[in-house]
């Protein structure tokens, strides 16, 4: 970040630099560190040794680019080569070779990975930082017990507790603990030393029984510690193997604190142990015990576990480095096993023959395929991409879980100020556990989050002396004020300046201050910073607005927002979705796929830019780049050449500016329902493009290969009409539900055809054997239709199984216009579902005759307290009339009271003067106007708020959710229809739905839903037969299957319950068996 002194001019940082810098650190340092740990491997006799020279490792350039990796459904990776040497120590013979260790996935310039053709992102994880932490808790008798916890680099914990009798224990698990004296003696200390080093040594002996008044010897201590930590019973004698096993199972997991933990412990305990010592040493434990004793006798401040100074971010470099460590350990074991079987009398083998790429390839496949923090990239729009890369999660291995996370962990902490956004977090179970980095926040190499501040100079004439990045711990020592305060304003007001100091908010004189903030929005995430008039919105609604902007689908004709915050260009630029010129020159050629530029510096040098053309994203939205330059245009380096699918003119454009009115209309906008004008459909204002991928594999079965062919038996010619002679769909074909995309036949077992009724009939009448293949064609899914835009044959080799897999991928493009049931939203958390589409002539219209585009409910504003939408729509109306765009930083009222209201009204007044339309600003009802009813031509009774709002179309669309079924699968246990569209489920009546029908007295409807349409097996067969034959549907008279299930479960509890039928004629009863 760059600043000019004595000014507020600065350059925003690259929003995805954290990902890129972290991966660069992994390549430059992480790999080297892991290779340096790799030992020289020797065989059991010590004659052969195998050595990897990790300092000279090399990464080859990927064999194909990112686009080819996506097209071929392969991984964008680089081969890792390391010099290796095998030596026979007796004969001193050596063989050296540069060997292939495996492939490492490479991060793209956009900060993501391409794994098997799909874009993936590694989410940063925030965990407790290694080190020492003091705390207190209540025991079973409600007494306060003090504890100190050592957290290792691997997440293991070593907890020391002091109970109410002043005895100190080492906690092994919830139910097991041992005296701390055992641990100290097992670490090599003797009792004489402990008497001198511990401040109150009598506390260590308080646990001993009367019979044993002398402490254990070191060997006895090791045996006792081994017995308790490894849960071993019986007689154990001391041996060196026990010491080694104790080291691996206890000390390595719980006591390896790393360099960060060493710094933390040295600082808290005032020790000067070298940073290279990465394990706990006896001095650490002794100092911690003395400190714990001291804290138990005094009232002192304990550590706040939720403070960011006690939490560290695990970046991409840390996660990938740990995977390389796992892979190299596997490789080490593999080499050692191979070396056991080498005949030493023969020639030395080549180093490559002892190594295979499987350990590294398998480890990364497992990591990218199943690790919870390695996720499919959210590619709904560029904002969703960039937000996903800046996400921080407390979940995952070594972290919290949704069930165990308490309210304190999820809550906003004062140390988050300027580092983690207090607004943007998911709704639901992950609230507070998944967060987003603040807009200017950075993560340093140790994993601590920093925020930049402008340093104030004590000299009266020099206010600023540059900027500094401070982490949470450093911040506590400085007095920091907000960005709008300066020496001049403080002197004019003559009042103390509000500051924050040591997590408290207070006020002091300006000359005592050290730093001030840079931006009023530096505390918020990118998505939250894109909300204009953010300060007028309730935090809950701002959260929804932040999340819903990421769900906006790219539109066919997007518009820039009339009212924005000024960050729209930076977000589009840093998302890497735009195409920028890398050289200065003249545009030589441009079309929809390529832009060629002739260099202005080097003669006859051309630079070609390949554009993304109707590619599918992970969320089935459309990735597309549109050139904005023309032939013979002169461009400079860094100038925009092409827009992406959700950008316009280099700014992020997620929606459209439309004319809205806040008024009720015949109940069609009750609650969150929305009424829209048909203009939005006919003019493609909210039309979006979606691309669906259909995939089918062609396998070699045990009975022979599967066939791709057009000749499919038992299917009509109509369903096969779009196939070419080879059985693949023709490019450009329009397909509907059920149409065949790929004709495929799979071999059937010999004799299986004769077991089928149709096979036996053909054989009996004509003597013809039925086909030895059955149809397994790829068909268009129910409810889908569209145009085929691509057909791809993909041949991929599995490096682990050495098998080649042939796959056919079909891409179908669909244009979706807005319709009833689609979800729309603004940027202020104001969301709704389309309830009705009205003709233009029936919509209310303003005084110049323009019909309203969207009618929103006015009751959705006051109770939700998101007044920012009102300011936005009024200022948008003024901007539309004045042909202006506004870029307003949130918190504009820091300069003046009612600044937002004054700005909106003054701009409406200017629009009234500019256009001559008096209705734009009426002094009696400012911001409101008289509307006319499109059906009658009469005015509405009251003035109505009208304006231009920026409305988004969200990815929650009715085409993806609507579902109907006539027949389908049933659950084997309850015999009720399955749930969900994906499983072809049916409508399921829950308890509350039954109550609703009971309330209306719909007895017959209720009976039908609870019997025939649910789990009455006999009744539904009878109903189907009656429908087919055209007879009346009989009344259900059999027992539903769910009732039978209840009876069986009660019988399992030894309750003898019978189901009886009562006859109306003679009131006789009959037991019904089932």
UniProtKB/Swiss-Prot annotation:
<dbReference type="InterPro" id="IPR042107">
    <property type="entry name" value="DNA-dir_RNA_pol_bsu_ext_1_sf"/>
</dbReference>
<dbReference type="GO" id="GO:0032549">
    <property type="term" value="F:ribonucleoside binding"/>
</dbReference>
<dbReference type="GO" id="GO:0006351">
    <property type="term" value="P:DNA-templated transcription"/>
</dbReference>
<dbReference type="GO" id="GO:0003899">
    <property type="term" value="F:DNA-directed RNA polymerase activity"/>
</dbReference>
<keyword id="KW-0548">Nucleotidyltransferase</keyword>
<comment type="function">
    <text>DNA-dependent RNA polymerase catalyzes the transcription of DNA into RNA using the four ribonucleoside triphosphates as substrates.</text>
</comment>
<dbReference type="InterPro" id="IPR007641">
    <property type="entry name" value="RNA_pol_Rpb2_7"/>
</dbReference>
<dbReference type="InterPro" id="IPR015712">
    <property type="entry name" value="DNA-dir_RNA_pol_su2"/>
</dbReference>
<dbReference type="InterPro" id="IPR007645">
    <property type="entry name" value="RNA_pol_Rpb2_3"/>
</dbReference>
<keyword id="KW-0240">DNA-directed RNA polymerase</keyword>
<dbReference type="GO" id="GO:0000428">
    <property type="term" value="C:DNA-directed RNA polymerase complex"/>
</dbReference>
<dbReference type="Pfam" id="PF04563">
    <property type="entry name" value="RNA_pol_Rpb2_1"/>
</dbReference>
<keyword id="KW-0150">Chloroplast</keyword>
<dbReference type="InterPro" id="IPR037033">
    <property type="entry name" value="DNA-dir_RNAP_su2_hyb_sf"/>
</dbReference>
<keyword id="KW-0808">Transferase</keyword>
<dbReference type="Pfam" id="PF04560">
    <property type="entry name" value="RNA_pol_Rpb2_7"/>
</dbReference>
<dbReference type="InterPro" id="IPR007644">
    <property type="entry name" value="RNA_pol_bsu_protrusion"/>
</dbReference>
<dbReference type="InterPro" id="IPR014724">
    <property type="entry name" value="RNA_pol_RPB2_OB-fold"/>
</dbReference>
<dbReference type="GO" id="GO:0003677">
    <property type="term" value="F:DNA binding"/>
</dbReference>
<comment type="similarity">
    <text>Belongs to the RNA polymerase beta chain family.</text>
</comment>
<dbReference type="Pfam" id="PF04565">
    <property type="entry name" value="RNA_pol_Rpb2_3"/>
</dbReference>
<dbReference type="GO" id="GO:0009507">
    <property type="term" value="C:chloroplast"/>
</dbReference>
<dbReference type="InterPro" id="IPR037034">
    <property type="entry name" value="RNA_pol_Rpb2_2_sf"/>
</dbReference>
<dbReference type="InterPro" id="IPR007642">
    <property type="entry name" value="RNA_pol_Rpb2_2"/>
</dbReference>
<dbReference type="GO" id="GO:0005739">
    <property type="term" value="C:mitochondrion"/>
</dbReference>
<dbReference type="InterPro" id="IPR007121">
    <property type="entry name" value="RNA_pol_bsu_CS"/>
</dbReference>
<keyword id="KW-0934">Plastid</keyword>
<dbReference type="Pfam" id="PF00562">
    <property type="entry name" value="RNA_pol_Rpb2_6"/>
</dbReference>
<protein>
    <recommendedName>
        <fullName>DNA-directed RNA polymerase subunit beta</fullName>
        <ecNumber>2.7.7.6</ecNumber>
    </recommendedName>
</protein>
<dbReference type="InterPro" id="IPR010243">
    <property type="entry name" value="RNA_pol_bsu_bac"/>
</dbReference>
<dbReference type="Pfam" id="PF04561">
    <property type="entry name" value="RNA_pol_Rpb2_2"/>
</dbReference>
<keyword id="KW-0804">Transcription</keyword>
<dbReference type="InterPro" id="IPR007120">
    <property type="entry name" value="DNA-dir_RNAP_su2_dom"/>
</dbReference>
<comment type="subunit">
    <text>In plastids the minimal PEP RNA polymerase catalytic core is composed of four subunits: alpha, beta, beta', and beta''. When a (nuclear-encoded) sigma factor is associated with the core the holoenzyme is formed, which can initiate transcription.</text>
</comment>
